[in-house]
Regions:
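N-terminal, active-site-proximal structural segment of metallo-dependent hydrolase catalytic domains
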Residues: 1-107, 118-122
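Beta-strand-turn-beta hairpins that frame and shape the catalytic cleft
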Residues: 24-35, 133-138, 149-169
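Hydrophobic pocket-lining residues within nucleotide cofactor-binding pockets
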Residues: 40, 88, 137, 145, ...
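Loop/turn elements at helix/coil->beta-strand transitions in domains of secreted/extracellular proteins
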Residues: 79-82, 109-112, 163-165
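Short beta-strands and strand-loop turn motifs
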Residues: 84-87, 114, 168-170
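Generic recognition of short, well-ordered alpha-helical segments
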Residues: 95-99, 127, 142
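Conserved beta strand-loop-helix elements of the APE1-like EEP
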Residues: 106-108, 123-140
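A short, structured active-site edge motif that brings together acidic residues
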Residues: 110-123, 143-145
């Protein structure tokens, strides 16, 4: 398993670009920024507390319902301009080798996205945070959090100077 682990690249990053969705770039006519923070639980559906026990296997193994759940999430995300994702999978066995941040960026027609791989367990699991945006970030910074390894924060900046917007995405668990 050690051979699958990759070094985390801390520091400044450029967003990934969905060339097909650059027309969806920018704010709507009312100039309001619509924000969403969403813990997607790797695309698992949880309707009651007992599902954390009875469906816990879905955090490790693939299952049929995940693709449909991701499509529903993608439809929901399309109503927002900036989305913070927690508990996304970066493309391991449990997600059917689908990078869920990239997939949701495509489904929601976001021109810009970034995936922060926090805990790389290779083919088994790739625990990630993500950012989806209709605005091009001027800077994206990846920061490890103190404490146990495998946690991080993404600092996303829009603009420069005193009117710049800074958004921090993280998952504390």
């Amino acid at each position: 398993m050690r051979g699958w682990k990759s070094k985390r690249i801390v520091g400044l990053h450029e967003p990934q670009v969905n060339e097909d969705h650059l027309a969806a770039c920018g704010l709507p006519d009312d100039r309001r920024l619509r924000l969403l923070s969403f813990n997607i639980q790797v695309g698992n559906s949880t309707q009651s507390y007992r599902h954390y026990l009875t469906r816990s296997w879905q955090h490790v193994l693939p299952h049929k319902g995940r693709a449909g759940n991701l499509d529903k999430i993608g439809d929901l995300l399309s109503d927002f301009d900036l989305v913070a994702l927690q508990e996304a999978d970066g493309g391991s066995h449990r997600s059917g080798y689908i990078n869920q941040v990239k997939y949701l960026a495509q489904q929601g027609e976001f021109p810009y996205w970034y995936q922060q791989l926090n805990r790389n367990l290779g083919r088994l699991a790739q625990h990630s945070n993500g950012v989806l945006s209709r605005l091009r970030p001027t800077a994206i910074e990846d920061h490890p959090l103190p404490g146990p390894a495998g946690r991080g924060a993404i600092l996303v900046r829009f603009g420069t100077g005193p009117d710049a917007l800074a958004v921090v995405v993280m998952h504390l668990a």
